[in-house]
Amino acid sequence: MFMKDILQSSECIEDQQNISMRPNLLDEFIGQSSVVSNLKIFIDAAYERKEPIDHILLYGPPGLGKTTLAHIIAKELKVNFRSTAGPLLSKAGDLAAILTNLQARDVLFIDEIHRLNRNIEEILYSAMEDFSLDIIVGEGCGARTLRVDIPPFTLIGATTRIGLLSNPLRDRFGIPMHLEFYSTEELTKVIKRAAKVIHTNISNNGAEEISLRSRGTPRIALRLLRRIRDFISVTKQDTITHEFADQALLRLGIDKLGLDRQDIKYLQFIYEANNPIGIDTISSALSEDTGNIEETIEPYLIKINFIQRTPRGRVITQKAISYLNEQTYNM
């Protein structure tokens, strides 16, 4: 595997259309106020001492800004940014090639770090703690370990499933940071800023309507904004108003709470079962990957108290049942 294959550009890791909307500095970053406030202190301290900032673990549901924050940290530190993803690092040589090509204080970003091969993960231990690599040279009885020094660097790991990280790896991150779902007010600001960047007029009520149906997630908000911009371009409307946003989102299959058809199928399946249901059964019924269910569907449904995870399986709440009974869905 060539270096260009394992060192992915940001365009490959994150939706290309979001890049122009991405903030470049912490002062431009909206939301995650506690995380941003602490990062400013850690970055300033590291920059003043001319040392790499301690290794950072960003975790939380998808689409909350983990990749964006990693980019910003490198820019604030005025160092190079290198990025890859856990599934791409299949061999020890892949990781060694990246680490030995880093410069002092560079930032290495590993997305989906929970998907690292355990053998690859073990190589990171000495790299993170001692800034060195233990490489086995030779085979059989003649094999020996060669220690190679690497420049001091910062590893930023991102994961949507922190529970899948081994304790030894998790404990080596000096700065663990949990990203939370966004409030409606924060998402409204994100949408208005993005609309300005892409030269699209939007009313305050229009931005708020999109934010209310974006599941507390900036990535979803920006995706919906782009799709509504398509509608407004074709219909020759001047501004995204509350009414226009509402109608466009309904055409996209997004209801008042931001639930789509797959969410409703998920809820109806559990409701009709009338018993706790295991994730594998749900996955089979919906023809949906279990990882996708656990990472993209369930977190928001848990947040709005529509489902509960129990030792026996998933259980629908009375709040969700009432909501389903109030709605009429064209499945």
UniProtKB/Swiss-Prot annotation:
Region (Head domain (RuvB-H)), start-end ranges: 256-331
Species, as recorded: Ehrlichia ruminantium (strain Gardel)
Coiled-coil regions listed: none
Descriptive protein name: Holliday junction branch migration complex subunit RuvB
Assembly mode: Homohexamer. Forms an RuvA(8)-RuvB(12)-Holliday junction (HJ) complex. HJ DNA is sandwiched between 2 RuvA tetramers; dsDNA enters through RuvA and exits via RuvB. An RuvB hexamer assembles on each DNA strand where it exits the tetramer. Each RuvB hexamer is contacted by two RuvA subunits (via domain III) on 2 adjacent RuvB subunits; this complex drives branch migration. In the full resolvosome a probable DNA-RuvA(4)-RuvB(12)-RuvC(2) complex forms which resolves the HJ.
Single GO MF descriptor: ATP hydrolysis activity
Single GO BP term: DNA repair
Domain notes: Has 3 domains, the large (RuvB-L) and small ATPase (RuvB-S) domains and the C-terminal head (RuvB-H) domain. The head domain binds DNA, while the ATPase domains jointly bind ATP, ADP or are empty depending on the state of the subunit in the translocation cycle. During a single DNA translocation step the structure of each domain remains the same, but their relative positions change.
Primary enzyme class: hydrolase
Superkingdom in the source lineage: Bacteria
Binding site for DNA: 309, 314
The entry's keywords: ATP-binding, Cytoplasm, DNA damage, DNA recombination, DNA repair, DNA-binding, Hydrolase, Nucleotide-binding
Gene: ruvB
Family, per entry: Belongs to the RuvB family.
